[in-house]
């Protein structure tokens, strides 16, 4: 940048537009010296951009080629050197030329064909670190200028906008000020200093924003709201805008725009937001096929008959006739139960008798018409049987089954004996009575402990009582006096002596000194006088 060490701070702030914005220092630029933006003179003050100082008309430059050209003529004027047609904001060219030429008073030897003058742009370190070539081919169209005026280029490449540095973080044409509190940001109002009123500058700002977000070359006239607030509608303006029939070549063409580049592939960038193609997964009943999809998509269609079916009429809804017919055809592929009870469409390999699924299905369908078969097919609801379901006791003493009027007997619960084997009816009166007196004590104890709750246990207890064995209710054992030993003490209520206890766990008799109270002994079991035990008689 141009050093003005001899001037005061107020004079520095009153430099002309070109002297504040584009100050020339070709030596630093040609030698490739990098700068990290430490020089504050490269930043301009927006409030003092355009005041005119007649005594500061001419600016000394290190080289004659570093003189600034007429800004309006080179950027917005008749670009005859490039051979490119006028476009965009050409109607504002005289005003731009007039306002800029009055404020700059450039030397006469600088012509529009000279191109964009050499400007000392402070760029970050680039891989090449070389000399930036400046020639007429680096002339910019007005849309590229718009990308450089305070708006970061989408490609961040100065070479694509006319002044280029291959570094992505290079600044644009007009250097933007740093984010400092004392600096004023570049706004739309400052654009009026270039010969445009505020409305024209606002329209230009919108068009520049549209170019940046849409990736176009500025060939359409877009006005209204800033598209950065509506990124989802960015692609729609490509079709709705009125384009120039002969647009200039856009250096950003072919690049994917930032808006929607993550969620949309490159081949769908020109499509509007619509659902004419199924953007959402279809319902199971839909067999719609996207014409842009490959033929392999037909493999994912559900088809029970083994044939691939597709429809180009769109998805079918349940109310359509075709879908109803298709559903009926699919239902006929399963097992069908006719009203007369016959079963058709039985798959191969399925059991067809009454013991398989076909028999169960037939039985259930028959139970729907015959209420008497509900208990056989589906079972009974226990809450309707009048039983106490919270009782921990067994149900069989009181409830046999829903069809039985009396409880089951114990011998009829565990198993069922065919009538051919029930011979006790014929021989019950011919069998001799059992005489337990013939058996020893060991067998009697076996009958007592192994036939709990049976009459045989009661008969064995009677026989043991007859043999001077007594059952102690507290000790729950059988005791008897030791043979040949009298009690050492005997009263009307108790006695003391040596007794034999029968140990059922070790199956033996154990002698023990014991104080016996008579009221704790079990009485003799009571049996009918005419009772003559015969196990065969207890079969029924």
Curated annotation (Swiss-Prot):
Coiled coil: none annotated. Ubiquitous. Highly expressed in brain, heart, thymus, spleen, kidney, liver, small intestine, placenta, lung and peripheral blood leukocytes. The keyword Cytoplasm applies. Residues 96-126, 276-342 are annotated as: Disordered. Keywords: Cytoplasm, Developmental protein, Disease variant, Intellectual disability, Nucleus, Phosphoprotein, Repressor, RNA-mediated gene silencing, Transcription, Transcription regulation, Translation regulation. Residues 437-540 are annotated as: Repressor domain. GO terms for biological process: negative regulation of intracellular estrogen receptor signaling pathway; negative regulation of transcription by RNA polymerase II; nuclear-transcribed mRNA poly(A) tail shortening; positive regulation of cytoplasmic mRNA processing body assembly; regulation of stem cell population maintenance; regulation of transcription by RNA polymerase II; regulation of translation; regulatory ncRNA-mediated gene silencing. The keyword Repeat does not apply. Its main location: cytoplasm. InterPro entries: CCR4-NOT_su2/3/5_C_sf (IPR038635), Not2/3/5 (IPR040168), NOT2/3/5_C (IPR007282). GO terms for cellular component: CCR4-NOT complex; CCR4-NOT core complex; cytoplasm; cytosol; membrane; nucleoplasm; nucleus; P-body. One of its GO terms (molecular function) is transcription corepressor binding. The modification Phosphothreonine is found at residue 93. It comes from the Eukaryota. Residues 96-123, 289-313, 321-333 have a biased composition (Polar residues). It is found in: Cytoplasm; Nucleus. The modification Phosphoserine is found at residues 126, 157, 165, 169, 242, 274. It is linked to Intellectual developmental disorder with nasal speech, dysmorphic facies, and variable skeletal anomalies: An autosomal dominant disorder characterized by delayed development, speech delay with nasal speech, and characteristic facial features including upslanted palpebral fissures, anteverted nares, a thin upper lip, and micrognathia. Some patients may have skeletal anomalies, such as brachydactyly, toe syndactyly and flat feet. Component of the CCR4-NOT complex which is one of the major cellular mRNA deadenylases and is linked to various cellular processes including bulk mRNA degradation, miRNA-mediated repression, translational repression during translational initiation and general transcription regulation. Additional complex functions may be a consequence of its influence on mRNA expression. Required for the CCR4-NOT complex structural integrity. Component of the CCR4-NOT complex; distinct complexes seem to exist that differ in the participation of probably mutually exclusive catalytic subunits. In the complex interacts directly with CNOT3. Interacts with NCOR1, NCOR2. HDAC3 and GPS2. Belongs to the CNOT2/3/5 family. This is CCR4-NOT transcription complex subunit 2. It comes from Homo sapiens (Human).
């Amino acid at each position: 940048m141009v050093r003005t060490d001899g001037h005061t701070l107020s004079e520095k702030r009153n430099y002309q537009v070109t002297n504040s914005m584009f100050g020339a220092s070709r030596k630093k630029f040609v030698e490739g010296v990098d700068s990290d933006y430490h020089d504050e003179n490269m930043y301009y003050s927006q409030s003092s951009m355009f005041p005119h100082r007649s005594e500061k008309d001419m600016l000394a430059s290190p080289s004659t080629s570093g003189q600034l050209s007429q800004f309006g003529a080179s950027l917005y004027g008749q670009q005859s050197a490039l051979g490119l047609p006028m476009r965009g904001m050409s109607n504002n060219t005289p005003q731009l030329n007039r306002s800029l030429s009055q404020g700059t008073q450039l030397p006469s030897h600088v012509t529009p064909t000279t191109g964009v003058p050499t400007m000392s742009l402070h760029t970050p370190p680039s891989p090449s670190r070389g000399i930036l070539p400046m020639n007429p081919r680096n002339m910019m169209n007005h849309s590229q200028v718009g990308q450089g005026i305070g708006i970061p280029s989408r490609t961040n490449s100065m070479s694509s906008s006319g002044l280029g540095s291959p570094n992505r973080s290079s600044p644009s044409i007009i250097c933007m000020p740093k984010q400092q509190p004392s600096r004023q940001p570049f706004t739309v109002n400052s654009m009026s200093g270039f010969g445009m009123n505020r409305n024209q500058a606002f329209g230009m700002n919108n068009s520049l924003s549209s170019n940046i977000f849409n990736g176009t070359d500025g060939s359409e006239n877009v006005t209204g709201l800033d598209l950065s607030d509506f990124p989802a509608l960015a692609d729609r303006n490509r079709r709705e805008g009125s384009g120039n029939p002969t647009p200039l070549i856009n250096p950003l063409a072919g690049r994917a725009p930032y808006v929607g580049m993550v969620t949309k592939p490159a081949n769908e960038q020109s499509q509007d937001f619509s659902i004419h193609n199924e953007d959402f997964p279809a319902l199971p009943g839909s067999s719609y096929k996207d014409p842009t999809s490959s033929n392999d998509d037909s493999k994912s269609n559900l088809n029970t008959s083994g044939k691939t079916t597709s429809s180009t009429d769109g998805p079918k809804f349940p109310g359509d006739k075709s879908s109803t017919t298709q559903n009926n055809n699919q239902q006929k592929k399963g097992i069908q139960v006719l009203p007369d009870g016959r079963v058709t469409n039985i798959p191969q390999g399925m059991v067809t008798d009454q013991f398989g699924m076909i028999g169960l299905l037939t039985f259930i369908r028959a139970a729907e018409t015959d209420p008497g078969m509900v208990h056989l097919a589906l079972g009974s609801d226990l809450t309707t049987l009048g039983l106490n379901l919270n009782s921990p006791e067994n149900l069989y003493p009181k409830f046999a089954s829903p069809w039985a009027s009396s409880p089951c007997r114990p011998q009829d619960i565990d198993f069922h004996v065919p009538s051919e084997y029930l011979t006790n009816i014929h021989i019950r009166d011919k069998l001799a009575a059992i005489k337990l007196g013939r058996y020893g004590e060991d067998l009697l104890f076996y009958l007592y402990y192994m036939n709990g709750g049976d009459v045989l246990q009661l008969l064995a207890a009677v026989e043991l009582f007859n043999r001077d064995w007594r059952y102690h209710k507290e000790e729950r054992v059988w005791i008897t006096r030791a043979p040949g030993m009298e009690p050492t003490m005997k009263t009307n209520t108790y006695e003391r002596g040596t007794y034999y206890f029968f140990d059922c766990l070790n199956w033996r008799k154990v002698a023990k000194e014991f104080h016996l109270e008579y009221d704790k002994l079990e009485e003799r079991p009571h049996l009918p006088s005419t009772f003559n035990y015969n196990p065969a008689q207890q079969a029924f």
